[in-house]
């Protein structure tokens, strides 16, 4: 049977508004398989970002305990779909059943670990919003002062996952981001179009207990230009050159800098040089064959951590 993947935006499976589709292929055999990928363009890509930017409360509003319950449910659903994941990973990645099964099991455990953190992030197992760090400090008047910090969600997290480990290298970004109360927009590799169908089902489980748009899943983008300043973080796996390519193919242009930390100068958002935000590519290696690294682009200049 012909499998057709769609976009997952605002809790709804939708076809591309511009009607673009591309054939899926079996990477292992380099032949076409029975499926078509619904491609997304700029208007669809911007939709989840526009809706979520600055509205983190829609995820936080679910509450830490509810986020924990949802993430545990996602893990169970994921493992129940193991045979389907194995089948699709064999077609698209050429993975053996043993390797694909391991990835599903490990990915489910990532969500379980993330679930265990959901009620701890704000400093209490009961999930109340209390200061997470506090210390007393002497003051000249002798009364003393209490300093404390409160953890808050970053905002919208854009996740770009690679073709070779499409599940594991996606879940260990998505799980912690949701546990911390962020909203997430996922863009799998264009090669993993059929694999995305299984991802969508997990997204629907998460969104079932959250406000509309907590998770969005897009397909292939002709241009990675859905990035916007103001709290957006893009997390991807690969060498620094991958981040540079994405930056060059988006609304951001590269300026000079060393190989390990590159400044990205946004175009079209800043009228004056002093208004430019300064996102960075962090912890990336430009040398190939050095294992998996993570490139994290923080659009508001803050330092965001990711795994890859």
Swiss-Prot record:
GO cellular component: periplasmic space
Keyword DNA repair: no
Known EC number: 1.2.1.-
Annotated Pfam families: Aldedh
Keywords: NAD, Oxidoreductase, Periplasm
A GO MF label: oxidoreductase activity
Regulation: Completely inhibited by HgCl(2), CoCl(2) and CaCl(2).
Activity over temperature: Optimum temperature is 35 degrees Celsius.
Superkingdom of this protein's organism: Bacteria
Keyword Coiled coil: no
Subcellular location: Periplasm
InterPro entries named in the record: Ald_DH/histidinol_DH (IPR016161), Ald_DH_N (IPR016162), Aldehyde_DH_dom (IPR015590)
Family membership noted in the UniProt record: Belongs to the aldehyde dehydrogenase family.
Cited function: Catalyzes the NAD(+)-dependent conversion of limonin.
Protein name in UniProt: Limonin dehydrogenase
Organism: Pseudomonas putida (Arthrobacter siderocapsulatus)
């Amino acid at each position: 049977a012909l499998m057709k993947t769609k976009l997952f935006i605002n809790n709804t499976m939708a076809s591309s508004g511009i009607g673009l589709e591309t054939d899926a292929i079996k990477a292992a055999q380099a032949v076409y398989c029975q499926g078509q990928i619904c491609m997304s363009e700029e208007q669809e890509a911007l939709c989840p970002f526009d809706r979520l930017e600055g509205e983190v409360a829609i995820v936080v509003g679910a509450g830490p305990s509810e986020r924990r319950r949802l993430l545990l449910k996602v893990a169970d659903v994921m493992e129940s779909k193991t045979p389907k994941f194995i089948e699709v990973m064999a077609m698209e990645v050429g993975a053996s059943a043993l390797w694909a099964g391991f990835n599903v099991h490990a990915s489910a455990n990532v969500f379980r670990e993330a679930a265990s953190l959901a009620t701890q992030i704000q400093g209490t197992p009961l999930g109340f919003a209390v200061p997470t760090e506090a210390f007393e400090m002497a003051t000249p008047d002798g009364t003393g002062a209490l300093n404390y910090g409160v953890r808050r969600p970053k905002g919208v997290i854009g996740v770009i996952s690679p073709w070779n480990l499409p599940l594991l290298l996606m879940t260990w970004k998505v799980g912690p981001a949701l546990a911390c109360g962020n909203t997430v927009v996922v863009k799998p590799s264009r090669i993993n179009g059929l694999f995305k169908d299984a991802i969508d089902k997990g997204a629907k489980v998460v969104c079932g207990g959250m406000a509309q748009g907590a998770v969005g899943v897009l397909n292939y983008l002709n241009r990675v230009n859905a990035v916007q300043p103001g709290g957006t973080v893009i997390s991807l796996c690969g060498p620094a050159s991958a981040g540079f390519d994405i930056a060059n193919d988006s609304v951001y242009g590269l300026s000079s800098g060393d190989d390990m930390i590159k400044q990205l100068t946004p175009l079209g958002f800043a009228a004056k040089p002093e208004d430019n935000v300064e996102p960075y590519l962090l912890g990336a290696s430009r040398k190939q064959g050095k294992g998996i690294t993570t490139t994290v682009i923080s659009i508001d200049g803050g330092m965001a951590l990711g795994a890859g």
